From Swiss-Prot:
CDD domains: Ribosomal_L13. This protein is one of the early assembly proteins of the 50S ribosomal subunit, although it is not seen to bind rRNA by itself. It is important during the early stages of 50S assembly. Keywords: Ribonucleoprotein, Ribosomal protein. The lineage of its organism: Bacteria, Pseudomonadati, Pseudomonadota, Gammaproteobacteria, Alteromonadales. It comes from Colwellia psychrerythraea (strain 34H / ATCC BAA-681). This is Large ribosomal subunit protein uL13.
Length: 142
């Protein structure tokens, strides 16, 4: 018997809805990253995007444990000398609540073109409303 290799054209993708309210950031991000990669499927192939679409609602209500709300720092650089920027979790969740979950999931995906393609299937919304009711996403309990 030969090893099965999934073809990009034959992959069946589903839509899932995840409610992030009162969920721990890292735990929900690992489950989302696994689903985006397609590792939960029997036909998973490392070099093919076999993952599903994930719609996350209530991203503003995600939480972190311990003192990470003040202590977790996100860094970015403007690429100019002295251009290192930093912002705490507490301030970033107020300023751009969707970015917190996006940063966590993106760091768990492969780096390169395949990882960017997987990341495009993640749709994050700060509140309970989303624009994907036409796709009829299934509720995913994590």
């Amino acid at each position: 018997m030969k090893t099965f290799v999934a073809k990009p054209a034959s992959v069946q993708r589903e839509w899932f809805l995840v409610d992030a309210e009162d969920k721990t950031l890292g735990r929900i991000a690992t489950e989302i990253a696994t689903r985006l990669r397609g590792k939960h499927k029997a036909e998973y192939t490392p070099h093919v995007d076999t993952g599903d679409y994930i719609v996350v609602i209530n991203a503003e209500k995600v939480r972190v444990t311990g003192n990470k709300a003040k202590g977790k720092i996100y860094y970015s650089h403007t690429e100019f000398p002295g251009g290192l920027k930093q912002i705490s979790f507490e301030k970033l969740i107020e300023k751009a609540p969707t970015r917190v979950l996006e940063f966590a999931v993106k760091g768990m995906l492969p780096k390169g073109p395949l990882g960017r393609e997987m990341f495009r299937k993640l749709k994050v919304y700060a509140g309970p409303e989303h624009a994907h009711t036409a796709q009829q996403p299934q509720l995913l309990e994590l």
